[in-house]
Amino acid sequence: SAPSQDFMRF
């Protein structure tokens, strides 16, 4: 559901 690089949001 989230963008591919959304995990980089820190």
Curated annotation (Swiss-Prot):
One term under GO cellular component: extracellular region
Predominant location category: secreted
Keyword terms: Amidation, Neuropeptide, Secreted
Cellular compartments annotated: Secreted
Superkingdom of origin organism: Eukaryota
Record GO biological process: neuropeptide signaling pathway
Keyword Secreted (UniProt): yes
Protein name, as recorded: FMRFamide-12
Protein source organism: Sarcophaga bullata
